[in-house]
Amino acid sequence: MSFRVTQEDILSIPADAAALGLEMTMRIAAGPSCQRIADAGGEALRAAVRRVRFIPLGSAAEAELSALPFRHLLLTGEPRWLNGKCNELLVLRHCYESVFSLAESLGCKSLVMPFLSALYFHFPKEGAVHIALTQAEKAGLDVTFVADTPELLALSGQPYRRPEIVSYVGYYGDHALFELDNGLFARVDLRPELTEVSVIPYFEACYRTGNNPLQPLLPDAEVARLRRIYEESD
């Protein structure tokens, strides 16, 4: 529906639900907004988190708690940035998808949360903010993001620089692969009726052009078409 970014106190923002990130140890993430809620919830919040027991990375769950100014408190397992080759970007996107889906299933119309993984999990901040805003645009509720630093607030208002294609790697099956300038790879669907693009951290040798003598090379015009699909994608 809509989103906005603010630096207000997260507890002062009217919303049906709030969402927090959790570390793999099920501790509340160390960001200022997360800790603000943790301090307000006190031992009751810590007990509610323990009752949840475990949340897989990228998933979300509700913590049953009435001591906060929200009807629902949602938790999600935040990913850490390791080396960019462990599906970190995909997992972070799943965090938002899971949180928004759970909030909608609970009947929420509004949600407040910090930017996940953007401060203490070594994520590239620009990418973390971009994923948050892109997923919020698709959500069926009003989302308020609390930017815990001036840098995050500034990034939320800047155009996102899409990673540029460095080279065409090859294709396998229904997908072509392009190397990006951030060390990741863009996989683009070859089928004309589809315009699907996904970013992946690695590629298998089968994608390398010329490694399969039975696989014909793609015409330059087709490679150019696939490149345009990537450049025009979200």
What kind of feature is each model-predicted range?
Residues V5-Q7, S198-P201:
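Short loop/edge segments at beta-strand edges and connector loops
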Residues I165-G170, D174-H175:
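N-terminal acidic leader/helix
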Residues A176-L180, F185-V188, V197-V199:
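Short linear proline/tyrosine/threonine-rich motifs used for host-factor recruitment
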Residues R80-R162:
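Phosphate/ribose-phosphate-bearing ligand recognition and processing surfaces
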Residues M1-L106:
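Glycine-/small-residue-enriched capping loops at alpha/beta junctions
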Residues F185-P192, L217:
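Short amphipathic beta-strand/extended segments with alternating polar/hydrophobic composition
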